[in-house]
A protein has these predicted regions:
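ABC-family P-loop ATPase nucleotide-binding domains
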Residues: 81-137
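Catalytic Walker B motif of ABC-type/P-loop ATPase nucleotide-binding domains
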Residues: 150-154, 159
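The feature captures the beta-strand-to-loop junction immediately N-terminal to the Walker
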Residues: 34-36
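Helix-to-loop junction immediately C-terminal to a conserved catalytic motif
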Residues: 49
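Conserved ABC transporter NBD signature motif
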Residues: 57-68, 72-73
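Conserved beta-strand
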Residues: 6-9, 16-29, 57
Length: 237
């Protein structure tokens, strides 16, 4: 079992601050990070994955420090985000051949298998891909170097409902391989069936919830949405 520990990690921009954040994740479990746009979800994931520098604190993966050993740390993290840029004028296969060997556990065979399972055509140049296809490619690449943790920023947005179910089935298989998954997403009934833990971002503050709180949170979200609909109807129609 692997552990990803976030210890007082913080980040400040001109008009936003991610408050010092601490939590611990274990491999084999899916944690969902929810919250409104601009609440700090992407900021936390970018810092935790090593893509963006952070102001204070540290993250450790099985004792490997992001602050002190960033290359070794990032070698064990798979990161997926539509903000990531690969060689956009090249195909997924070319990107795999060029970038994959920089990871110590890269497997081109696993890359092929994952792309086939996700119904992804690897020959097109990346700039030609839709958002959903680009997220498929990134997920395959991230998993092909056999990370201990997979960090994903809103991976479901570009998927149609049919593929979304298939994608979550693949994620369940990844969890069964003892990989930890940390996903930012708007909570849905589909994610409810797979999520083990829930984190919530609100104006730069991150709160952690136990599994038994997930049902109550989702119920409250549904009630809130229904009340918003009723209010909108009463004001406009």
């Amino acid at each position: 079992m692997s552990e990803l520990i976030c210890n007082e990690l913080s980040k400040s921009y001109q008009n936003f601050q991610l408050s010092p954040t601490s939590f611990q994740l274990e491999s084999g479990y899916l944690t969902v990070l929810s919250g409104k746009n601009g609440s700090g979800k992407s900021t936390l994931l970018r810092c935790l994955s090593g893509v963006d520098p952070f102001c204070t604190g540290d993250a450790k993966l099985d004792g490997i420090s992001l602050k002190n050993e960033p290359d070794l740390y990032k070698d064990q993290i798979g990161y997926v985000s539509d903000e990531l840029t690969y060689f956009m004028e090249k195909s997924a296969l070319e990107n795999g051949a060029l970038l994959g060997p920089y990871f110590s556990n890269w497997s081109m065979e696993r890359y092929y298998i994952l792309m086939d399972r996700m119904d992804f055509s690897p020959s097109r140049q990346l700039w030609q891909l839709s958002k959903g296809e680009y997220m498929k490619m990134q997920t395959c690449f991230a998993l092909a170097h056999n990370p201990r943790f997979l960090i994903m920023d809103e991976p479901l947005e570009g998927f149609d409902p049919i593929f979304r179910r298939k994608f979550l089935s693949i994620m369940q298989d990844i969890l069964n391989e003892d990989v930890g998954i940390f996903i930012s997403s708007h909570i849905t009934e589909t994610l409810k069936n797979l999520a083990d833990y829930l984190m919530f971002a609100d104006n730069g503050t991150i709160s952690f919830h136990c599994p038994e709180q997930l049902d109550a949170f989702l119920t409250d979200q549904r009630k809130h949405s229904h009340s918003q609909i009723r209010d909108l109807l009463s004001r406009n129609f």
